[in-house]
């Protein structure tokens, strides 16, 4: 039923949700980046002429320093004995603490630019997107970089002069997760050797390489690849660490012979660690703790503790006698800048770790002071931007109590006194400088969030207005069908809302607000004007909707709905909440009056079994037994369904079903062989990969076409077709229990259809029972969430295991791997859309009734998550709150898509004893 009112709802709804989806990035995650700062040189007397930055991608701190037992040889040993010898004799070491997300791009940005890239970067992509801020490479004389095509280009393309950064990269196809990861690192060392050799044949190159201020960046991807493929406790991962340790002394010897001046500084670290499951991205300590070892020109030798110092994490390192100097990852950029005497990156927030520096205290203090001035420069530029766009400006309270100029004067006075021999003031000067840096960073956050309260109020009115606006349209479309034309707005309404709009738009204009802010304001003005004009429709529609129910029952229904929605909100953070709600729904048929014992018992059993999935760990470990069990259950359930519908199908359809069941069995066999081969480190058999893709394609595309040639329009037949169409694809993409969920989720919805049909048949009144529509909509929306959280959560997707795609795609291909992951996520929604479509037909609901009602209520979730967004703390928490908000705000549109998809999947389907069919 596509009338004017519904068209308005869809057009306004799509625009509203798309704009408000983006609102969090305009409000919460405005980039703190500022431009136009003056640079500050780290030191005029650099201790090193060049620097080698060696990054072991995905290398954990404990693996680097700990004594481990090799899983193949059984030998207990230190994997990196040479690096350990540096720590004990020649280097300063510590743990570099990363921030979340513990991914390659933000990790490298932090250590090379000294800047923790904000979440708004996710809107631009993270691989090929060049960094749009200053970096250590940008300040160097020249940078020679070797390694992965996922990392090197973003610093080359983002440099002020791209010719300043040279890159030597392997092709993406080189990143084969089933082959030896050591080859990736061997490429780096081999091409560095080639560069040195070429310089002996080219005088220009030789001159360029020997310039002061050069940087050599070695990006070693091997550990990350081995960790993803085989876990960080595997022989492959350990062997890769040993290979790196073997190559570093060779590298040092070649560098010393080539330059022959002992003026080279070396930094060895990692961008992030690796979880026990072979993933990273979240805030687990195994992901955030990385090694940092620094040696060479300008760097301190190890300092011995007067007494052994260790903790539970480091007790097996046998380094308790050596002082450990931990840093934040962004501090590495400041350290590297000092070592070769270049400017601090203009956007750096890193603090110079003076414990690593070998030099005069006055030089170190001067460098730290310039570090603080560089950060303060960002604050001053940002403050000027804010002052220029405000009617009234209120300065950050800590700088009101003590101005930044006062801080600078005090520090300069202390530095002057220290230079005159008062060395006892050094610690006071360092403490005061660090205090200035900390307050400056807090002030930057204050300026970035200066207009939060105003714009968040506008967005809140927008969400609440949409809820009432869409509910009024639902009432007009399905309950008060005699209301055709909208009520005319009164002159008072025009005057009031027009005045408010002019005033608020003027404020936005004065604040130099972007275009999106005007749209955020336009929607609440339109919604509340519409609500005010149609307030009589809202009153009469609610009265008709709850016709025949007592006031206390209305209150109970309202409380129940809000409780379910708030439970869903809580379930986004704690999946066990979905278990609780599913178990409560186990009594749903009995509460609604269904008294058939077999129906109720089967429903309770299925509900309890389905509820267990949200208790399982979202990060899964490959389990072939669970995959086998799920495949067997899918095959048995298909045979049982065929037995139940055998009288409704002809021989052609029966033969197609037999082929589909055979494809499920064949895919199970292919999955078994692929898993065994990959677990034995024998790679993916070519024939298994080809067979997997053939079955994948045939089941998803060929079989539906064969059914379409001679269609059977019975709804039970159509549901079985869809169930078997998706099953093979889901099996090969399953890591452990996902296919079991697929089987039980389908069983649950099939039973739900029959239960709702029985409830419908029990009603004798002629009037439309809107409470059943309400119940179906709420349960349907709940199942929309279960379809996602039943097999994982946001965090498990951000760090998904490669087992789910390596059986089809062993070569690294982020686009195709992402597409396969999305297919796996979408399949349960396809089943849900089919069942909602069947419910729509069996219960004689008008088309789009369910989606329209859900759309009017679902933004209860969006409003919750809007205020639950986090900008501080663990980046895992920050990322999850962003994803939760996006999932919630897209639920409205997704529900409509599901119902449209249901119409497509159920085209011409006939419900027995009903004359209605899909159009």
From Swiss-Prot:
InterPro entries: Alkaline_phosphatase_core_sf (IPR017850), GPI_EtnP_transferase_1 (IPR007070), GPI_EtnP_transferase_1_C (IPR017852), PIGN_N (IPR037671), Sulfatase_N (IPR000917). Residues 1-9, 479-488, 534-553, 598, 648-655, 709-720, 798-807, 870-885 are cytoplasmic. One of its GO terms (molecular function) is mannose-ethanolamine phosphotransferase activity. Glycans are attached at residues 90, 138, 198, 202, 286, 312. Keywords: Cell wall biogenesis/degradation, Endoplasmic reticulum, Glycoprotein, Golgi apparatus, GPI-anchor biosynthesis, Membrane, Transferase, Transmembrane, Transmembrane helix, Vacuole. PANTHER family: GPI ETHANOLAMINE PHOSPHATE TRANSFERASE 1 (PTHR12250:SF0), PHOSPHATIDYLINOSITOL GLYCAN, CLASS N (PTHR12250). This is GPI ethanolamine phosphate transferase 1. It comes from Saccharomyces cerevisiae (strain ATCC 204508 / S288c) (Baker's yeast). The lineage of its organism: Eukaryota, Fungi, Dikarya, Ascomycota, Saccharomycotina.
């Amino acid at each position: 039923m596509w009338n004017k009112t519904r068209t308005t709802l869809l057009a306004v709804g799509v625009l509203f949700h798309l704009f408000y989806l983006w609102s969090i990035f305009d409000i919460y995650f405005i980039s703190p980046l500022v431009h136009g700062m003056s640079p500050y040189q780290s030191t005029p007397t650099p201790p090193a002429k060049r620097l080698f930055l060696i990054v072991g991608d995905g290398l954990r701190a404990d693996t680097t320093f700990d004594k481990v037992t090799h899983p193949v040889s059984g030998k207990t040993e230190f994997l990196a004995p040479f690096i350990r010898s540096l720590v004990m004799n020649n280097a300063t070491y510590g743990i570099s603490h990363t921030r979340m997300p513990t991914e390659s791009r933000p990790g490298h940005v932090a250590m090379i630019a000294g800047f923790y890239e904000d979440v708004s970067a996710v809107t631009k992509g993270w691989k090929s997107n060049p960094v749009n801020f200053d970096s250590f490479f940008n300040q160097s004389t020249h940078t020679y970089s070797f390694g992965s095509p996922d990392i090197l280009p973003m610093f080359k393309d983002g440099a002020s002069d791209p010719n300043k950064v040279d890159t030597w990269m392997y092709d993406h196809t080189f990143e084969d997760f089933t082959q030896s990861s050591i080859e990736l690192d061997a490429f780096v060392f081999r091409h560095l050797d080639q560069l040195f050799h070429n310089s002996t044949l080219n005088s220009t190159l030789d001159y360029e390489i020997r310039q002061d201020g050069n940087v050599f960046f070695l990006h070693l991807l091997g550990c990350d690849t081995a960790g993803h493929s085989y876990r960080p406790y595997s022989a492959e991962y350990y062997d890769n660490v040993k290979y790196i340790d073997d190559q570093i002394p060779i590298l040092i010897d070649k560098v010393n012979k080539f330059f022959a001046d002992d003026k080279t500084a070396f930094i060895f670290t990692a961008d992030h660690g690796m979880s026990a499951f072979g993933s990273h991205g979240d805030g687990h300590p195994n992901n955030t703790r990385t090694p940092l070892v620094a040696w060479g020109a300008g760097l301190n030798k190890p300092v011995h503790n007067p007494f052994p110092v260790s903790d539970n994490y480091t007790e097996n390192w046998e380094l308790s006698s050596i002082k450990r100097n931990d840093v934040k990852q962004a501090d590495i950029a400041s350290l590297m800048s000092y070592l070769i005497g270049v400017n601090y990156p203009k956007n750096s927030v890193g603090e110079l770790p003076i414990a690593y520096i070998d030099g005069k205290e006055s030089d170190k203090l001067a460098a730290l002071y310039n570090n603080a001035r560089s950060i303060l420069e960002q604050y001053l530029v940002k403050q000027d931007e804010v002052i220029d766009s405000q009617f009234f400006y209120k300065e950050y309270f800590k700088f009101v109590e003590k101005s930044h100029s006062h801080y600078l004067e005090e520090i300069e006075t202390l530095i002057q006194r220290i230079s005159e021999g008062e060395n006892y003031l050094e610690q006071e000067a360092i403490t005061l400088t660090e205090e200035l840096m900390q307050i400056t960073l807090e002030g930057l956050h204050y300026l970035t969030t200066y207009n939060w309260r105003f714009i968040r109020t506008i967005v809140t009115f927008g969400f609440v207005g949409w809820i009432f606006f869409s509910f009024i349209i639902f009432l007009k479309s399905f309950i008060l069908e005699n209301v055709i034309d909208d009520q005319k707005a009164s002159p008072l309404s025009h005057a009031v809302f027009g005045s408010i709009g002019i005033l608020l738009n003027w404020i936005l204009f004065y604040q130099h607000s972007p275009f999106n802010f005007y749209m955020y304001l336009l929607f609440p003005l339109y919604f509340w004007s519409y609500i005010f004009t149609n307030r009589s429709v809202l009153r009469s529609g609610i009265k008709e909707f709850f016709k025949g129910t007592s006031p206390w029952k209305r209150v109970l229904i309202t409380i129940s709905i809000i409780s379910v929605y708030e439970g869903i909100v809580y379930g986004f953070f704690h999946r066990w909440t979905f278990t609780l709600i599913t178990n409560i729904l186990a009594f749903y048929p009995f509460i609604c009056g269904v008294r058939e014992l077999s129906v109720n018992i089967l429903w309770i059993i299925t509900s309890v079994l389905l509820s267990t999935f949200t208790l399982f760990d979202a990060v899964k470990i490959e389990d072939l037994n669970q995959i086998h069990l799920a495949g067997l259950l899918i095959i048995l359930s298909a045979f049982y369904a065929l037995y139940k519908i055998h009288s409704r199908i002809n021989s052609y359809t029966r033969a197609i079903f037999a082929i589909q069941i055979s494809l499920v069995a064949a895919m199970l066999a292919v999955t078994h062989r692929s898993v065994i081969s990959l677990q034995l480190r024998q790679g993916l058999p070519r024939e298994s990969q080809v067979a997997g893709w053939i079955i994948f394609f045939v089941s998803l595309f060929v079989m539906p076409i064969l059914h379409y040639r001679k269609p059977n329009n019975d709804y039970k037949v159509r549901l079985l077709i869809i169930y078997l169409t998706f099953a093979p694809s889901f099996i090969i993409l399953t890591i452990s229990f996902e296919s079991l969920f697929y089987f039980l989720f389908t069983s649950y919805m099939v039973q739900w259809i029959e239960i709702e049909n029985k409830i419908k048949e029990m009603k004798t009144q002629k009037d439309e029972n809107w409470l059943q529509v309400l119940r179906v909509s709420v349960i349907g929306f709940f199942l929309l969430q279960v379809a996602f959280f039943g097999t994982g959560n946001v965090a498990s997707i951000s760090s998904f295991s490669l087992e789910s795609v390596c059986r089809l795609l062993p070569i690294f291909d982020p686009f195709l791997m992402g597409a396969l992951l999305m297919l796996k996520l979408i399949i349960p929604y396809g089943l849900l859309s089919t069942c909602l479509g069947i419910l729509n037909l069996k219960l004689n609901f008008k088309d789009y009734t369910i989606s329209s009602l859900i759309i009017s209520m679902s933004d209860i979730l969006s409003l919750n998550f809007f205020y639950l967004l986090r900008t501080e703390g663990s980046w895992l928490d920050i990322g999850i709150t962003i994803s939760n908000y996006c999932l919630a705000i897209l639920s409205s549109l997704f529900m409509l898509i599901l119902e449209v998809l249901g119409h497509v999947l159920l085209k011409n389907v006939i419900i027995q004893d009903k004359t209605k069919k899909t159009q």
